[in-house]
Amino acid sequence: GHIVLNGDDDKLATVKGYKEVKPVFFGMSNECQVYGDKVVSRGLKGMTCTIHLGDTAFTVDIPMPGRHMVYNALAAAAVGNIYGLTTEQIKAGIESLEPISGRFRMIETDKFLIVDDCYNANPMSMKASLDVLQDGAGRRIAVLGDMGELGENEVQLHEEVGEHAGKCDIDVLICTGKLCRNMAERAQRTNPDLKVIYEPDRESLLEHLKGYVQDGDTILVKASHFMKFEEVVTKLENM
């Protein structure tokens, strides 16, 4: 077998191997066997970077936004290299990536650009999605719902996302769900000028959503799967 690990992760970088299998590391450091540099954001259209595989380097256009997608591309390049793919094949595979429903899928309607990221959520992915939203055109609106399975730190983790949202260059934050009340309150304390809206549940959000959005908005929709925010995406698509 093979082991492929993120060499930029402090804990994973210490792994020496397993049953005599040494890991292949990917990351932004040139100490990794597979590393990236010259990272450029193309806004919501994606990322561009140079990938280094040993003595070979090639530029790739990743058709999904966010710095975290560069790491996914590096991991894919590492696996492809292990299994003997050429750099041309690796590049073509990454550049032909098509997001699936609920996984950072861009939906352009006559009125909005919807960033459909509603399949699941954790604190890290929430923050990453908020970072990407800042590149949107028009008003930047984040429609966020509860994150599940966070254990005893669930309140604190929702507050941390709220603080991050308050520091982001967005226009409206709409928080939905019992735990998201903590997110909304922290965001408002962090940035009193940010328009923060709280809805107790999905049904209430769906009822009032039309009054919160306007033509030209870029709208991020993200929550844990149990929140069923695909209904929010559908509502926006049909406006």
Feature annotation, model-predicted:
Residues 4-6:
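ADP-ribose/adenylate-binding Rossmann-like module
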Residues 41-48:
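A short, compositionally biased
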